[in-house]
């Protein structure tokens, strides 16, 4: 019996093989998904890299940019201090205003750099002080640029202030008129009148165009630059629009009637002469207003970014 016994090989059940294959198949996607997650995590910048970028901005790029930006305040202040005042500006007290503007720009320069130096110890007070100072500078710049006309009359050397001081104050204008005459504003036209006619008024300074010649709308013919006569077949215009740069003003018939061929009178009493003087002295203050608007906005944005970077650095540190 023992010799006739046969050994039967034991085969693995099919279910066991199927389960093994299924387990192998399920582990492969899990391994792939884990590999993908690891690769994605490797692509994301670590927190240390982000903090390093914030530190570079807070400690290097933004402060240097703000300091360089504040140097324009210093340069403009020095330029105002050494810039020669226009003739007869002292009658209006504008040289004193020019000096005060220079001192104000120097003060803003000092405050801006002090805020940079103390930004880590006192970030919030430094930001508040700079916001107040820069908003005040922006408000003054809007007044000088003529954007806020209702408030600009309160500030010297603004458009409305010039109108009140020159157009509506006859005593002040008489003093300015005497000064303009004494400075010889029309002398080069009187003693060296150009021969070519009609004269190119656009190339002339505003004060020469307004004070030394009659308005173009008076329809006068010229013998030379300072001697004109009215055409007999044409009377004075019923109204005239005088264009002075960016301003359209409605003139008066009296401008044509006030013209005299006397060298001491010419058109010094005309409204066109007043507008010419205003244009000559106002351009510098209009440029100051544009500068204050631009630099205050840039400094405000720069200091705000520095505050945010410093706050983020403290929060993550």
Curated annotation (Swiss-Prot):
Signal peptide from the UniProt entry: none
Extracellular compartment segments: 82-96, 148-287
Comp. bias intervals (Low complexity): 7-28
GO CC terms: membrane
Annotated glycosylation sites: 224
Main localization of the protein described in the UniProt heading: membrane
Keywords, sorted A to Z: Glycoprotein, Membrane, Transmembrane, Transmembrane helix
Transmembrane segments: 61-81, 97-117, 127-147, 288-308
Disordered as annotated region, ranges: 1-43
Cytoplasmic side: 1-60, 118-126, 309-317
Job description of the protein: May be involved in the regulation of cell differentiation.
Protein name: Tetraspanin-15
Organism per entry: Arabidopsis thaliana (Mouse-ear cress)
Gene that produces this protein: TET15
């Amino acid at each position: 019996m023992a010799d006739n016994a046969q050994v039967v090989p034991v085969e693995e059940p099919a279910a066991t093989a199927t389960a093994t294959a299924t387990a192998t198949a399920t582990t492969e996607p899990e391994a792939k998904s884990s590999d993908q997650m690891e690769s994605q995590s490797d692509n994301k910048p670590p927190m240390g890299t982000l903090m390093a970028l914030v530190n570079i901005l807070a400690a290097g790029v933004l402060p240097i940019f703000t300091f360089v930006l504040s140097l324009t305040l210093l340069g403009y202040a020095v330029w105002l201090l050494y810039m020669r005042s226009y003739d007869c500006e002292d009658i209006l007290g504008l040289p004193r205003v020019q000096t005060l503007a220079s001192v104000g720009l120097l003060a803003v320069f000092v405050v801006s750099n002090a805020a940079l130096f103390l930004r880590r110890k006192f970030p919030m007070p430094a930001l508040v002080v700079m916001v107040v100072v820069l908003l005040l500078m922006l408000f003054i710049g809007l007044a000088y640029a003529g954007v806020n006309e209702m408030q600009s009359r309160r500030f010297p050397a603004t458009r409305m202030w010039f109108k009140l001081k020159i157009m509506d104050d006859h005593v002040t204008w008489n003093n300015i008129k005497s000064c303009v005459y004494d400075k010889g504003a029309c002398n080069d036209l009187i003693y060296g009148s150009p021969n070519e006619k009609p004269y190119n008024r656009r190339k002339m300074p505003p004060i020469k165009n307004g004070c030394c010649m009659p308005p173009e709308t008076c329809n006068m013919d010229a013998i030379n630059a300072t001697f004109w006569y009215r055409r007999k077949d044409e009377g004075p215009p019923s109204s005239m629009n005088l264009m002075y740069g960016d301003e359209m003003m409605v003139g008066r018939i009296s401008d044509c009637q006030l013209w005299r061929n006397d060298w001491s009178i010419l058109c010094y009493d005309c409204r066109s002469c007043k507008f010419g003087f205003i244009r000559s002295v106002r351009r510098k203050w209009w440029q100051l207003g544009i500068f204050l608007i631009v630099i205050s906005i840039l400094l405000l944005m720069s200091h705000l970014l520095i505050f945010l970077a410093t706050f983020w650095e403290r929060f993550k540190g």
